[in-house]
Amino acid sequence: MLNARATKRYLRSSPRKMRLVIDLIRGKSAAQALATLKFSPKSASKDAEMVLRSAKANVMEKATAANERVDEGKLFVSAAYVNQGPTAKRISPAPMGRAYRIRKRSHHLTIEVSVAQ
């Protein structure tokens, strides 16, 4: 079974927000997942769409290298997950001389695409 993955690291948004988008496409066919991401109003869907297109291209490239033919209709999202990246900490002035900590979160996105049997 041919499969390939694509990863985009250090994306500057909360992992929790990206997980909302990724849960929509996990297990779907690649074409259906792309359509879902394209029409999703979430800003995180743009990054997820780029990674999914890259994973699709990686499968096609692997198939070409192995002299195999792959029907794009048989591709599906076999795994998609979001890991937390580094958190940048900033200080915001607060009342009475105090300071509040602002956490600017980041995450790593991985999408794996496989060929259905």
What is the predicted role of each segment?
Residues 1-13, 20, 29-117:
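Structured, basic alpha/beta domains of bacterial-type, RNA-associated proteins
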